[in-house]
From Swiss-Prot:
It catalyses: 1-(5-phospho-beta-D-ribosyl)-5-[(5-phospho-beta-D-ribosylamino)methylideneamino]imidazole-4-carboxamide = 5-[(5-phospho-1-deoxy-D-ribulos-1-ylimino)methylamino]-1-(5-phospho-beta-D-ribosyl)imidazole-4-carboxamide. It comes from the Bacteria. It comes from Novosphingobium aromaticivorans (strain ATCC 700278 / DSM 12444 / CCUG 56034 / CIP 105152 / NBRC 16084 / F199). GO terms for molecular function: 1-(5-phosphoribosyl)-5-[(5-phosphoribosylamino)methylideneamino]imidazole-4-carboxamide isomerase activity. The keyword ATP-binding does not apply. NCBIfam families: 1-(5-phosphoribosyl)-5-[(5-phosphoribosylamino)methylideneamino]imidazole-4-carboxamide isomerase, PRK13585.1. GO terms for biological process: L-histidine biosynthetic process; L-tryptophan biosynthetic process. It is an enzyme of class 5 (isomerase). Pathway: Amino-acid biosynthesis; L-histidine biosynthesis; L-histidine from 5-phospho-alpha-D-ribose 1-diphosphate: step 4/9. The active site is at D8, D129. This is 1-(5-phosphoribosyl)-5-[(5-phosphoribosylamino)methylideneamino] imidazole-4-carboxamide isomerase. PANTHER family: 1-(5-PHOSPHORIBOSYL)-5-[(5-PHOSPHORIBOSYLAMINO)METHYLIDENEAMINO] IMIDAZOLE-4-CARBOXAMIDE ISOMERASE (PTHR43090:SF2). InterPro entries: Aldolase_TIM, His_biosynth, HisA_bact_arch, Isoase_HisA-like, Isoase_HisA-like_bact, RibuloseP-bd_barrel. Keywords: Amino-acid biosynthesis, Cytoplasm, Histidine biosynthesis, Isomerase.
Length: 241
């Protein structure tokens, strides 16, 4: 199982939001590249980066910060946030991003996401962001009438690398991962699932690890790391055991 430390970018700074609310951002630093190198020093080979401004704008808004991260982090970088055109997808791969995360595009234009998954094998992750079991888009501002499982199943034969499942109601609040919903999704869909939202400590890693065989590929953690509630090295060791 993979542990993805998260770097969320807002106006070039490292931040964490509460429930995806841009007005409830906590700033953790103004040097994303340095933060990425700290995660690498702790043993991380994977990183999850989100261009928050890009999520709302529908285009790259923190390109310079992302490029700095790519230069300072020797491992695999998974990037999301406003990536909705072929030019954007291919451009990020050219710069060294390992996987691109697509959320709003998956709901609004599923064929486009399938085309990208075909063109860039193993490179496309579909973000399934949920509020009370229903899919949310546009930086989580809009809630659709599509269920998480229904959206996920649309991509079962598309060749996407993973599903990134986020429970918005827990994100950035340290409430603990929504284990039941995450495991249920992993069991019902034939695509590996990455858990996100609410990680508060090592117990979340332990519980997800138990269900690795159900299709849990990894877990994303942000605030728990920044607040010192979760030791990254210990989390990686447990996940890889």
């Amino acid at each position: 199982m993979i542990v993805f430390p998260a770097i969320d970018l807002k106006a070039g700074q490292v931040v964490r939001l509460a429930e995806g609310d841009m007005d409830r951002a906590t700033v953790y630093g103004d040097n994303p590249a340095h933060q990425a190198s700290l995660f690498a020093q702790a043993g991380s080979q994977y990183l999850h980066v989100v261009d928050l401004d890009g999520s709302f704008a529908g285009r790259a808004e923190n390109r310079e910060a992302v490029e700095g991260i790519l230069k300072s982090f020797p491992g695999h970088v998974q990037l999301g946030g406003g990536i909705r055109t072929r030019e954007a997808v291919s451009g990020w791969f050219d710069l060294g991003v390992s996987r691109v995360v697509m959320g709003t595009a998956a709901l609004k234009d599923p064929q486009f996401v399938k085309d990208m998954a075909k063109e860039f094998p193993g490179g496309i992750v579909v973000a399934v962001d949920a509020r009370d079991g229903m899919v949310a888009t546009e930086g989580w501002a809009d809630v659709s009438d599509v269920s998480v499982v229904d959206l996920a199943r649309r991509f079962e034969d598309a060749g996407v690398a993973s599903l990134l499942f986020t429970d918005i109601g827990r994100d950035g609040l340290l409430k603990g991962v929504n284990l039941d919903a995450t495991v249920e999704l992993a069991r019902r869909v034939d695509i590996p699932v990455i858990a996100s939202g609410g990680v508060k400590g090592i117990d979340d890693i332990r519980m997800l690890k138990i269900h690795e065989g159900d299709g849990i590929e990894g877990v994303i953690t942000g605030r728990a790391l920044y607040d010192g509630r979760l030791d990254l090295k210990a989390a990686i060791e447990m996940a890889e055991a």
